[in-house]
A protein has these predicted regions:
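Conserved structural motif at the start of ABC-family nucleotide-binding domains
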Residues: 2-4, 17
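Short coil-to-beta microelement around the adenine-binding A-loop and adjacent beta1/P-loop entry
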Residues: 14-15, 106, 214
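The feature captures the beta-strand-to-loop junction immediately N-terminal to the Walker
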Residues: 33-35
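ABC ATPase NBD Q-loop/coupling interface
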Residues: 59-66, 73-81, 93-107, 175
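ABC-family P-loop ATPase nucleotide-binding domains
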Residues: 98, 105, 110-197
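Walker B catalytic motif
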Residues: 200-204, 211
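Conserved beta-strand-loop-alpha-helix hinge in the C-terminal portion
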Residues: 248, 252, 256-279
C-alpha cells in the first residue's frame, strides 16, 4: 500500500530525513518510535504534504483502495501520476500513485488521513459543516455525487455514537473549547467519517489519560484494523500499543529506520531506552 524508498527531507537548510525506507502492506499496523528530534513528526508532515518540508531525494508510492461507498480514488488524477508498481501488494488492477507529486488535498482524496499531535481549532466552522464538505470533496474527486444532508447525518451520528460522543459536539466549531481528550475523540469521529485507506497518526496518545487512551485505541481498531487498510502510528510510549497491537515496530533515529521488530521491541524500548537500539 505504501512504499517509501531512501527518503531525504530538509526543514530550512537542516537535513531531517536521511535515507528512510519503509513499506506498509494492507492489513498492517506499524508503530514508529524514537528519541526527540529523530524525524518522526517530519515523516508525517512530508507524507501529508505540509508546506516548509522539502523532499530532496527518494520516492513515496501509494496504492489506495476504493472507498466504502465505491468510486475510484484515482479517478481525477492525471494519467502521468498513476502507474502500476509491482513493489506494492494489492489487486492486480490497482494503480500506484506518486504521493509526493500530489497536493495535500489530493493525498487526502486518494485515501490518506493525517492525525495531529495537537488538533487545530477552527472558530466559526461547525464540525458538521467541516466534515460534510470534506467527505463530499472526496466523493467529487472519486467521481461520485455529493451526499445529501440526511445521508451525511446518518453516517455522522453512527460514528459519534461509536465513539461515545454527544452528537451536539458535532454542531460546535471544530475543536473550539474541547479538552485534549475531546479533541482526540473528535479526530476519531472524523477518521471514521472520512474512511481512509491509510492513517498516519502522529503522537495521537499525547496528553490522554487512561480512559481517553482506551477510547482512542478502540476507535483506531474499529475503523482501521481491516484487511484493506493500514496504519502508521508515531508514538513515544508503549502505552498506546497496549490497546493498538502493532504488527511491526520501527526505531527511527537520526532520520533513518535503524531497527525493526515485533510488538516486543516496544517493550524493550520502554525498558532500556533508545541509547543502544538507536545506534
Amino acid at each position: 500500500m505504501l512504499s517509501i524508498e531512501n527518503l531525504h527531507a530538509t526543514v530550512g537548510d537542516k537535513p531531517i530525513l536521511k535515507g528512510l525506507t519503509l513499506s506498509l502492506n494492507p492489513g498492517e499496523i506499524h508503530a514508529i518510535m524514537g528519541p526527540n528530534g529523530a524525524g518522526k513528526s517530519t515523516l508525517s508532515y512530508v507524507l501529508g504534504g505540509r508546506p516548509g518540508y522539502e523532499v530532496t531525494g527518494g520516492s513515496v508510492m501509494f496504492t489506495p483502495r476504493h472507498s466504502r461507498e465505491g468510486g475510484n480514488p484515482l479517478a481525477t488524477l492525471p494519467d502521468t501520476l498513476v502507474r502500476m508498481d509491482p513493489r506494492l501488494r494489492g489487486d492486480d488492477e490497482s494503480g500506484a500513485v506518486d504521493l509526493l507529486a500530489l497536493a495535500p488535498h489530493e493525498r487526502a482524496a486518494a485515501g490518506l488521513f493525517l492525525g495531529f499531535q495537537y488538533p487545530v481549532e477552527i472558530p466559526g466552522v461547525s464540525n458538521v459543516q467541516f466534515l460534510r464538505e470534506a467527505l463530499n470533496a472526496q466523493r467529487k474527486h472519486r467521481g461520485q455525487p455529493p451526499l445529501s444532508g440526511g445521508e451525511f447525518l446518518k453516517i455522522a451520528r453512527a460514528q459519534a455514537d461509536a465513539m461515545g460522543m454527544d452528537f451536539d459536539m458535532l454542531k460546535r466549531p471544530v475543536n473550539v473549547g474541547f479538552s485534549g481528550g475531546e479533541k482526540k475523540r473528535n479526530e476519531m469521529v472524523q477518521m471514521g467519517i472520512i474512511d481512509p485507506a491509510l492513517a498516519i497518526l502522529d503522537e495521537t496518545d499525547s496528553g490522554l489519560d487512561i480512559d481517553a487512551l482506551r477510547v482512542v485505541g478502540d476507535g483506531i481498531n474499529r475503523i482501521m484494523r481491516k484487511p484493506d487498510k493500514a496504519v502508521l502510528l508515531i508514538t513515544h510510549y508503549q502505552r498506546l500499543l497496549d490497546y493498538v497491537k502493532p504488527d511491526f515496530v520501527h526505531v527511527l533515529a537520526d532520520g533513518r529506520i535503524t531497527r525493526t521488530g515485533g510488538a516486543e521491541l516496544a517493550l524493550e524500548l520502554e525498558r532500556d531506552g533508545y541509547k543502544e537500539l538507536a545506534a
